[in-house]
């Protein structure tokens, strides 16, 4: 049987796994699903229409699955989905999607969202990411995998932060962040490769050296994006398949990438 504190308020339409823990003064609303071994420590509110996976930790005063902060929202049935093995620290707010953009906000697995992080409506967040204290993620943002966003940073709506990148603290991101890059500042500017992140993943020196070449081609050579893509595909992709991440970043960007 689920470990539910007697002060918790649980909707009759909520589904809670028998191994989950619901702490003191938590509220679990209508049509909420909570998976195995997930813990709501205390004073956590899961408003409604939210699916939560396994082995997640939610800390006090986090607000999960609240209505989107969008003037177009008119009470439609929209959802928040959260995967497995995430840690959601104190006072985080994660909002559901809007009907205009598919009706879903989605957070993957193995993410750490530190104190007071906000994830707005219709965001898509992948796996193995760290969003530090007071990060604000506006609506319709896509965050890939293995990304660190420094504290007090803001990400403009519709931006994409691509895999293995690093956003420095107190950064204002107004354009897309290409894979592997480090950006910081207000507004954000590119400052090199996330080499330390690559080393922590155990990537070889040879791989990193080829990615350094790719960075110089895209950000320091003076070539147009079209010209840089040709060099990446013809000269560097045969040497290192990870170049595909960078090529994909450049090809799919709608806002232009941070340079």
From Swiss-Prot:
Keyword Transmembrane helix belongs to the record: no
Gene3D superfamilies tied to this protein: Hexapeptide repeat proteins, Udp N-acetylglucosamine O-acyltransferase, C-terminal domain
Listed GO biological process terms: lipid A biosynthetic process
GO molecular function: acyl-[acyl-carrier-protein]-UDP-N-acetylglucosamine O-acyltransferase activity
Function of the protein: Involved in the biosynthesis of lipid A, a phosphorylated glycolipid that anchors the lipopolysaccharide to the outer membrane of the cell.
NCBIfam families from the UniProt entry: lipid_A_lpxA (TIGR01852), PRK05289.1 (NF003657)
Quaternary structure annotation from Swiss-Prot or TrEMBL: Homotrimer.
Name of the featured protein: Acyl-[acyl-carrier-protein]--UDP-N-acetylglucosamine O-acyltransferase
Species the sequence originates in: Psychrobacter arcticus (strain DSM 17307 / VKM B-2377 / 273-4)
């Amino acid at each position: 049987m689920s470990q539910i504190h007697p002060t918790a308020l649980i909707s009759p339409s909520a589904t809670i796994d028998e191994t989950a823990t619901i702490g003191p003064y938590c509220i679990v609303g209508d049509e909420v699903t909570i998976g195995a071994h997930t813990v709501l420590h205390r004073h956590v509110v899961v408003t409604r229409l939210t699916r939560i996976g396994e082995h997640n930790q939610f800390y006090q005063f986090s607000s999960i699955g609240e209505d989107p902060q969008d003037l177009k929202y008119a009470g439609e049935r929209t959802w928040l989905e959260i995967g497995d093995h995430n840690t959601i620290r104190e006072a985080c707010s994660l909002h559901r999607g809007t009907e205009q953009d598919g009706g879903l906000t989605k957070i993957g697995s193995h993410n750490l969202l530190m104190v007071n992080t906000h994830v707005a409506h219709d965001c898509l967040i992948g796996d193995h990411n760290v969003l530090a204290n007071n990060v604000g993620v506006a609506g319709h943002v896509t965050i890939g995998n293995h990304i660190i966003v420094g504290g007090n940073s803001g990400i403009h709506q519709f931006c994409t932060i691509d895999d293995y990148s690093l956003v420095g603290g107190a950064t204002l991101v107004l354009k897309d962040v290409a894979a592997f890059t480090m950006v910081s500042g207000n507004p954000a500017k590119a400052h090199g490769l996330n080499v330390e992140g690559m080393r922590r993943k155990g990537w070889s020196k040879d791989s990193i050296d080829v990615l350094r070449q790719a960075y110089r081609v895209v950000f320091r050579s003076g070539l147009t994006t079209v010209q840089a893509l040709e060099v990446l595909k013809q000269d560097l992709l045969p040497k290192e398949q990870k170049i595909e991440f960078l090529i994909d970043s450049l090809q799919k960007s709608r806002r232009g990438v941070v340079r």
